[in-house]
From Swiss-Prot:
One Pfam family of this chain: UbiA
UniProt organism field: Arthrinium sp
Cellular component GO terms, alphabetical: plasma membrane
Any GO MF annotation of the entry: transferase activity, transferring alkyl or aryl (other than methyl) groups
InterPro entries: Prenyltransferase, UbiA_prenyltransferase, UbiA_prenylTrfase_CS, UbiA_sf
Cofactors (names): Mg(2+)
The keyword Transmembrane helix is annotated on this UniProt entry: yes
Function of the protein: Polyprenyl transferase; part of the gene cluster that mediates the biosynthesis of the meroterpenoids arthripenoids. The pathway begins with the HR-PKS atnH that catalyzes two chain-extension steps to form a reduced triketide, which then primes the SAT domain in the NR-PKS atnG to initiate three more cycles of extension to give a linear hexaketide corresponding to the polyketide part of arthripenoids.
Keywords from the UniProt entry: Glycoprotein, Membrane, Transferase, Transmembrane, Transmembrane helix
EC number: 2.5.1.-
Glycan attachment sites: 9
The name this protein goes by in its record: Polyprenyl transferase atnF
Pathway: Secondary metabolite biosynthesis; terpenoid biosynthesis
Main location: membrane
């Protein structure tokens, strides 16, 4: 509940900004689809493996549930960590100054306690649902998620660290099912490449809306570094992600449904996103980011439908 404080002139109680429950909810990004979009990367990889290996329904179902719980919790906890690290920057950027930490909705001490408890909870849930091997595979993801916010102060391409973090999310699903599978060939590598290029591309689009404020605040970003060549960089990343997805679909022996409603739709989205991005409009990047986040969920759904039809 929001605490009440006294006005300095003693004229009566007013509401403070402090609201722990609402603040943690927002720090966890539970008011957005970002967590679901993160889980969809794991689901997408799982469904590609299931298509290639013709996995049993029970195995896919159990991995699906475990991936959702693990990736959702990991996303929540490290979004909170990102906001802890960025609290001073966020207060200087128009779009983020109302976030829970700079606005006083949650104190730094409270946020740190929730973060520590959340890390242990994420590890415990991963071990319980997916086992020791997958938990070990998640360790690099947790480490990179911890490092990523700090990179904004050190290197000009923190998006590369984020891309590596999210691309590694294609590996735990494979570890979860590999005991019941044969060789995956180039499928894990091609999925890794596709997700890496997509996430760097996606975060560049997102970061484009904050470039003026980030420059003033001293935040390092590939979007700032590229300057007028931003769309050229997006084009290269867009082509590479499509090439990697085509290779992944070929490796998985994808059916007509996945090729037409998955790969083709994804390929068409790339030029649309780049041409629609208006760097003069501060809200353009956010809109296109949201469309692409939904696209990731859509791609996972199409891949899942493809697997379901093959099973039945």
């Amino acid at each position: 509940m929001a605490r009440k404080v006294e006005k300095e002139n003693g004229s009566g109680p007013i509401k403070s900004n402090h609201d722990l429950v609402r603040g943690v909810w927002q720090l966890f990004r539970l008011h957005t689809i970002e967590g679901l979009s993160t889980a969809s990367i794991g689901w997408l990889a799982l469904f590609f493996y299931a298509t290639q290996q013709q996995l049993a329904f029970d195995l896919v179902r159990n991995a699906f549930i475990g991936i959702f719980a693990t990736y959702q919790m990991t996303h929540c906890v490290f979004c909170l960590w990102n906001d802890i690290c960025d609290r001073d920057f966020d207060g200087k950027v128009a779009r983020t100054r109302d976030r829970p930490l700079p606005s006083g909705m949650v104190t730094l001490t409270e946020a740190m306690w929730v973060f520590v408890l959340g890390v242990f909870a994420s590890m415990g849930v991963t071990y319980w649902l997916l086992g020791a091997d997958v938990t070990l595979t998640m360790v690099p993801i947790w480490v990179l998620s911890f490092i990523y916010p700090l990179c904004k102060r050190i290197i000009w391409a923190p998006q590369v660290v984020l891309g590596l973090t999210m691309a590694l999310c294609v590996l735990p699903p494979w570890v979860a099912v590999r005991k019941n599978s044969g060789s995956a060939g180039l499928l894990p590598a091609s999925l890794f490449g596709a997700i890496f290029c997509w996430l760097v591309y996606l975060d560049l689009i997102y970061a484009s809306q904050d470039r003026p404020d980030d420059q003033k605040a001293g935040v390092k970003s590939l979007a700032i570094f590229l300057g007028d060549y931003l769309k050229a960089g997006l084009t290269v990343l867009g082509v590479l992600q499509v090439v990697c997805f085509v290779l992944a679909a070929s490796e998985a022996s994808a059916g007509f449904l996945l090729w037409v409603f998955g790969i083709a739709v994804w390929s068409a989205s790339v030029p649309w996103s780049i041409m629609s991005l208006d760097t003069r409009d501060r809200k353009s990047g956010g809109r296109i980011f949201l469309v692409n986040a939904i696209l990731g969920i859509y791609m996972a759904a199409v891949s899942g439908l493809n697997v379901s039809l093959a099973m039945w």
